[in-house]
Amino acid sequence: DAAAQAMSGSAPILPGATLGVLGGGQLGRMFVHEAQRMGYVTVVLEPDQSSPAGLVAHHHIRAAYDDEHALADMARLCAAVTTEFENVPAPTLQALSRSKPVSPAAEAVAIAQDRALEKAHFVRCGVPCAPHAVIETPDHLAAVQDDLLPGILKTARLGYDGKGQVRVATREALAQAWNELKQVPCVLEKMLPLAAECSVVVARGQDGQIVNLPVQRNLHREGILAVTEVHPGNVSEAVSYTHLTLPTTPYV
């Protein structure tokens, strides 16, 4: 029936319907602007009253991402819900998905917000990863192989724009860095002579059709993205690795 189609996401959500987005940042603002241009009503759930997306949405629910009353309002107002960044609690997406289509799914967001889970997911998918080790306990730290050094110690969660990352060359420096990071779960990645970092953005429809945008090359300064260039050259390898992850990554 129509309700089952809506929940499965197989029924089209036409302009005039209300779309919800969790998070009020710049990406959310871009989503809101484009949705409004297409004729949709927009709702943003974001605790910051002056957030970029909340300021331009039709409705701004100012509450925490795990506020039960706010989530009930989102479910009541919206035909479908998405998130504009990866650090929305996965249980929030899971709760909303019980009554409305949610994409990306909670399982995908849980992977994206944890570097250790992300590495394990890529390995299962057959995507080559830099040699690495997960460090969660002193025993894990002691078991790190010498051939992973020099490396970069990264917090498993919440690091961005160079934050939560420390370059280490020796075991002593590794131990000191883990202490400086408050001994939170971390991933140690071996430093490699990288030719470039690429981004592959793909979109998948409910019919399973997959389209990838032009591949981008990213240039960083001090661990922070500075320039992104679109390269039309030979990027088939990067695209193929991305497609390996899609069968087990619930994005639409």
Predicted regions and their residues:
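ATP-binding N-terminal substructure of ATP-dependent carboxylate-amine bond-forming enzymes
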Residues: D1-Q113, L117, D139
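A conserved helix-loop-beta module that forms one wall/lid of the active-site cleft
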Residues: S99, A105-V166, R171
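Structural detector of well-ordered beta-strand residues that form the stable sheet scaffold
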Residues: V43, T82, V102-S103, A130, ...
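Internal nucleotide-binding/catalytic subdomain
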Residues: V168-L244
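Short, basic and Ser/Thr-rich N-terminal targeting/leader segments
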Residues: P15, P128, Y160-D161, L194-C198, ...
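Single conserved hydrophobic/aromatic residue that forms the stacking wall/gate
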Residues: H243-V252
